[in-house]
């Protein structure tokens, strides 16, 4: 069982967030033109698929996008304090390769500034708009903390898009693993019509979220976030689930960036 965070720590966290002097600066992405690479028949290394040319890319030139990554808040990628099943092996070199990724020309972060809702209507720390402010800084005052257990945040992109990449940052001030991470795309704001739901990431190998068993790996949070290949999935809404973390039962989100083009 994961430990319950004492009430005193929760109250202390609220006070700290209220008086924090840290500021969340803007974060963007640099675009560069890139010719479409030749197709490769070799299988990607673990964790590397998101950096490859996205599947289902329409014909035409691609561009390179290099988001502005926040500074690391710890050195290296130390293992979590408790054993984690299905945990990917840390690969700093692969993380560097994924800093720049290819997407179709015209792709932008369509999530920036969009409305965010949540399964927890009263976050313990922070506000939901932090999830789409474009800033991935892990400092105090730059994240929203939701209640223990299974929770989600949802972004309304306001219209349907072809989604190529999703870049997700949970709390990365410490070396932690967030559990049962599932990311889904849909045109149904309630996510009830299964025929309209596309799951683009799922490391819930035990199906604790009751959303289906996943095949992705657990990973340690870093300043690079987690880059996910959405393969052109169509949808208006993005929902990100988590179920506590390796340090405590809370769910903390910093930023979600959705790189997409108008739906075709």
What do the PLM-derived regions correspond to, one by one?
Residues 25-27:
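Bacterial signal peptide processing site
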Residues 54-80, 119-121, 144-151, 160, ...:
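Trp- and acidic/polar-enriched beta-sheet ligand-binding modules for extracellular glycan
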Residues 99, 103-135:
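Predominantly extracellular/luminal regions of secreted and cell-surface proteins
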Residues 1-11:
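Bacterial N-terminal signal peptides that target proteins for export
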Residues 34, 44-107:
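N-terminal pre-domain segments of enzymes
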Residues 20-23:
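C-terminal motif of bacterial Sec signal peptides marking the signal peptidase cleavage site
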């Amino acid at each position: 069982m994961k430990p319950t965070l004492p009430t005193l720590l929760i109250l202390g966290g609220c006070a700290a967030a209220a008086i924090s002097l840290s500021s969340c600066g803007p974060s963007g992405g640099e675009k560069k033109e890139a010719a479409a690479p030749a197709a490769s028949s070799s299988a990607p290394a673990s964790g590397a698929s998101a950096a490859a040319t996205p599947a289902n890319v329409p014909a035409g030139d691609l561009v390179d996008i290099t988001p502005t990554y926040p500074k690391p808040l710890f050195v290296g990628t130390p293992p979590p304090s408790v054993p984690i099943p299905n945990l990917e092996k840390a690969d700093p070199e692969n993380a560097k390769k994924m800093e720049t990724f290819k997407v179709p020309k015209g792709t932008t972060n369509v999530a920036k500034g969009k409305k965010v809702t949540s399964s927890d209507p009263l976050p313990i720390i922070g506000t939901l708009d932090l999830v789409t402010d474009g800033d991935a800084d892990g400092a105090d005052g730059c994240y929203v903390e939701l209640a223990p257990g299974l929770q989600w945040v949802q972004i309304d992109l306001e219209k349907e898009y072809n989604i190529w990449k999703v870049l997700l940052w949970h709390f990365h001030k410490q070396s932690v693993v967030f559990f049962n991470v599932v990311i889904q795309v849909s045109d149904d704001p309630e996510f009830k019509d299964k025929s309209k739901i596309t799951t683009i990431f799922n490391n819930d190998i035990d199906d604790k979220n009751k959303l289906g068993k996943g095949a992705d790996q657990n990973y340690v949070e870093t300043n690079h976030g987690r880059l996910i290949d959405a393969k052109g999935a169509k949808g208006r809404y993005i929902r990100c689930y988590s179920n506590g973390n390796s340090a405590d039962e809370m769910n903390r989100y910093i930023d979600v960036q959705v790189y997409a083009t108008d739906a075709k």
